[in-house]
Swiss-Prot record:
Entry EC number(s): 2.8.1.10
Keyword Transferase: yes
Primary location class: cytoplasm
InterPro entries reported in the protein's UniProt record: Aldolase_TIM, Thiazole_synthase_ThiG, ThiG
Official protein name in the record: Thiazole synthase
GO cellular component: cytoplasm
Organism annotation: Sulfurihydrogenibium sp. (strain YO3AOP1)
Length: 267
């Protein structure tokens, strides 16, 4: 009999030497308040939550602080450099986050275009090289380009985070073959980031064999964020199981599920 809990315990996501039972990473933005962030995060089962260091208070104890709501013994705070448009800004933000949180994990974002929020790959690569040399565990947000993904692996990044679609668009996965090419090109974890709209999007991404998925808007802006968080939890597990189970080949024509031999009325 299949034991789901045992499977999840043994099928862990490993990034930078740290193990995570959940392959779902969630964001902390766009919720109505920190209490809702807490409830949705716990409902999702995620063990990592991203925080935009330049936008969310994690340092000033005199103001409402996200860290007062998240149990950091169970859920890791993954700072990101959202809002940065140059390598220099991103590097400074990462250093501030390390000082505040006491660890060197960082989701590296260097945006190149305000309309699409696509990453500036040149600036991102420049920042990643410096941060890796300074001992950070770098998870860069990148375009779905396998050549660039390999370059980030070569300079020592702990994972790559290619987009499924523009941030907050809810369009779902637009270029599945590009994600497959990235998965083939690198040995580090591939975490699909941005563009997820609903649970089926998450399942489809995971069915490709990627190592995890990160989302924020899909949960935070849902009509009921808590229910959507639960849906995403199960969608990610379902997609992972489907990938490991192995889907049947696609065929143009029908294939009867029951044998034709011995059918009544036929010789």
């Amino acid at each position: 009999m299949f034991d789901l809990e045992k499977f999840l315990e043994n099928d862990k996501l490993v990034i930078g030497g740290k193990e995570f039972k959940s392959r779902l990473i969630v964001g902390s933005g766009k919720y109505k308040d920190f209490q809702q962030t807490k409830e949705a995060t716990e409902a999702s089962g995620a063990e990592m939550i991203t925080v935009a260091v330049r936008r969310v208070n994690i340092t000033d104890p005199n103001q409402d602080n996200l860290l007062n709501y998240i149990d950091t013994s169970k859920i890791m705070i993954l700072p990101n450099t959202a809002g940065c448009y140059t390598a220099e800004e991103a590097i400074l933000t990462a250093k501030l986050a390390r000082e505040a949180l006491g660890h060197g994990f960082v989701k590296l974002e260097v945006i190149g275009d305000q309309k699409t929020l696509y990453p500036d790959m040149i600036e991102t690569l420049k920042a990643a090289e410096i941060l890796v040399k300074e001992g950070f565990t770098v998870l860069p947000y990148i375009t779905d380009d396998p050549v660039m993904a390999k370059r980030f692996e070569d300079i020592g990044c702990a994972a790559v985070m290619p987009l499924a679609a523009p941030i907050g668009s809810g369009l779902g996965l637009q270029n599945p073959y590009n994600i497959l090419f990235i998965k083939e090109a690198v040995k580090i974890p591939v975490i699909v980031d941005a563009g997820i709209g609903t649970a089926s999007d998450a399942a489809i991404v995971m069915e490709l064999g990627v190592d995890g998925v990160l989302m924020n808007t899909a949960i935070a802006q849902a009509k009921d964020p808590i229910k959507m968080a639960v849906a995403m939890k199960h969608a990610v597990i379902a997609g992972r199981l489907a990938y490991l189970a192995g889907r049947i080949p696609k065929k143009m024509y029908a294939s009867a599920s029951s044998p034709m031999e011995g059918v009544i009325g036929r010789n």
